[in-house]
């Protein structure tokens, strides 16, 4: 055991400059691209499934490795990567804390299980179904890693697209109705969050999560911002009375899609509510 932890410490020293979070985000998409460009060669369902399963398992073990490297004695964000995306406006900034790392591991653990389960629930266009799952894994991990509100929003909303396709193409008899209901409810629910993010940038001049923790926001704006974020997350959690899209989505989605929806996609809203709502409205949240 001692030798094992010594080995981990040595690797820790060498990996500090390695973009492990970006690797976790991008690896599923690389697997999806491989399946897309080798479609004619991977019509064999077993081959496509093994490629997707291998990709997701590598990501799972990479997340376990991240857990071993994670310093549990501090509450600070770790493995932070900060790169300019749009100068003076948006930075690609990712990092993890004690909450987000657990959701990342949950995501990488559930994804291979969903891929294993497709034998009985998916009988057509398996290649495209696996691509949708891998792309969705990229977006879900991106949500839990984001340290910029714009990046968080983009990953959050992008996750709707593969789930919309999973329900609409591979779902049950009422799949089209359920898919559009899911998409429209959750998309319209995000309008307030987008308005709130734009307002935060207008008030503070930044969407960087770490900087917002330090800056704070005038109390006269806090109630409105809190309400906007809470309303958006309430639709996606979902809470009564804006929960009516969920039963249809669960019933019509294939098994793997229903598992991803329940185990991870709904948790993204809860994570956002816990991690970000109080960030902009300390006093309102405490009240």
Regions picked out by a protein language model, each given a short descriptive name:
Residues 42-44, 131, 135, 139-217:
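Alpha-helical multi-pass transmembrane bundles of energy-transducing inner-membrane proteins
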Residues 71-91, 190-249, 270-280:
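Juxtamembrane/interfacial segments at transmembrane-helix boundaries in multi-pass membrane proteins
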Residues 11-22, 34-131, 210, 214:
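Transmembrane helix-loop-helix hairpins at membrane boundaries of multipass inner-membrane proteins
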Residues 19-27, 98-106, 150-159, 223-230:
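Structural signature of hydrophobic alpha-helical transmembrane segments
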Residues 281-287:
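A short, hydrophobic C-terminal helix/tail in secreted or cell-surface proteins
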